[in-house]
Each structure stands twice: as C-alpha cells, then as structure tokens.
Amino acid sequence: MIHISIVILTYNSANYIKSCLDSVYLQRYQNFEVIVVDNGSKDDTVSLIKKNYPQVILIENKDNLGACKGRNQGIEVGRGEWIFTLDCDIILRNDFMGEIIKIIKSVPKMIGMLQPKIMKIDKIRVFSAGIYVSFLRRFHDVGKDEIDSAKFSKQMDIFGVCSAATVYKRDMLEAVRGENGYFDERFFFLFEDVDLSWRAQKKGIKALFCPDAACYHYGNSSCTPEKTRQYLCLRNRYFTLLKNDFIGSIILSFVFYDLPRLLYIFMANPRSLRAIKDIFDFKRS
C-alpha cells in the first residue's frame, strides 16, 4: 500500500488544529502518518495535540522558524513515498485520501505534484486550484474567489501548486532539494511554493490539478499583520524571480508591473524599503 506522510504546521493554532486532525483521522484510507511541526505556539496547541492525538509525531520548535523550515523538518522525518503538506486550518473531505491514492496510481511518472481542489470554508468559492504565472510574472491562485463550477471539475496541467494542501512525490522533492532545503528557508513563508514548483518544472517535473480530492480552507490562521505580509510578498517575489527566471523577463516585470506600484507600497508601508536591501543581498549570495 502507498504510504503518505502528512506534514502539518501549527503556530498558535488551537482554534483550528482539532478540526483539521479530526478530518484526517476520519479518512477511509488510513495508510499514513501525521507529523505536526509546531513553531513555538504560545496557546494550547501543543497540549491539545498531546492529549487528544498521541499517535501524532510532534516536533516542537521553541521559536517560529517559518513555514519553510517547519515543512522541511516534517519532510525529513516523514517515511512516506508521498508527502502531503497541509495547513492546520484546512478540513479534508471524508474521501480525500482515497481520491488521492486513486490519482497516484494512475498518473504518469513525470507528475510529481498533485494539487487538490482547495475550497474556501463556505464550500462555495474556490481558494486555489493551483498557481498560474502571467507574462509579467504575476502569480495567481487559479480560480481564487470564483464560485465553484464545471471548469473546476476536470483534471488539468498547472504551472505550480499551493502548499497549503499539496501532495508531493518524495523522489521529486529530493530531486529539487537545494542547499537551503526542499522549501528555501530564506523565504520564511510566502512564495516558497511558487519557487519549489518552478524548480520542479525546470527539471521536467509536472503539476496536476485533481478536483476529486477536495478540502476546505479558513485562510490566514496565523493572523500575519498586513504590513509584514506585504513586505514578504515583495521580497520573496524577487527571490523567486532571481532564482528561476531570465533577466529579460525580470526587467520587463519590474518596468511594467512593479515600478508603477512601488511608490504607493513604500509610502503606505516604509518597512517594504527593507525588501530592496534584502533582494540585493539575496542576489549577491
């Protein structure tokens, strides 16, 4: 039987983790292990897990090491042939794991990333059907905020996957692993899934949207402040481009997409200026 390692991150997640884990353990397909990586929660997250889910493999970090480092820790511990990264504020449909197993058994060898249909918690609107990259290097969640419809009912090739809920082939992760880990730990969080998807694509590893495996996402359970998110988005966007893209495309993107909006961003959030220094430091490294 195919064995899957489910890697879940928590950070002050007591309000969400029980619903998430309950949905995991109610799955009909049970050949999996659950690894929870806690990033220094100050609430009851850890005690709740220890009391109610003794079967969970629990990694306790003293501080918030970020999504990238946390996921990498879980992947390294996991023994599965496939790795399922799962945000703690997601609830799986009861047939989720069974559908994933069907897909794993049927996909071609070059498929290394499976994107479930991530719905918003209202079960009406789509949160993500994968990641799309535009000519000007804007990155979008496919279908974000759209009402679920027939166009999200068929498998389709996609550029990348949303790591809030993605199933990765272990061999694929080993193939793209760099000196900064599977997920690049310099990112902390945001855009790390775009970067990983892009590195995989450059090695000929493909991503597939799998609508029959559905889950439901609350969103932003970490309550990241908007200005922090804005800073990380700007910084990590360019980390991603500098690692993976051609210089001509980066220049086009900067002139026609980023430049017009930078003045507003810097005026509204002076902290974002720090992103410029970080980007130059990243390039030098």
Where do the language-model regions lie?
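Short aromatic/hydrophobic "clamp" motif used to bind/position activated sugar donors
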Residues: 83
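Short, flexible, basic/aromatic active-site loop/helix in glycosyltransferases
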Residues: 134-158
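N-proximal low-complexity "stem/linker" segments adjacent to membrane-targeting elements
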Residues: 1-26
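A conserved acidic beta->alpha catalytic loop
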Residues: 23, 38-47, 63
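Conserved donor NDP-sugar-binding/catalytic core segment of glycosyltransferases
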Residues: 94-128, 132-133
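Glycine-rich, basic loop-to-helix element that forms the pyrophosphate-binding segment
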Residues: 61-78, 88
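Active-site-adjacent helix/loop segment of glycosyltransferases
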Residues: 207-285
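A short, conserved alpha-helix in the catalytic core of glycosyltransferases
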Residues: 159-177, 181-214
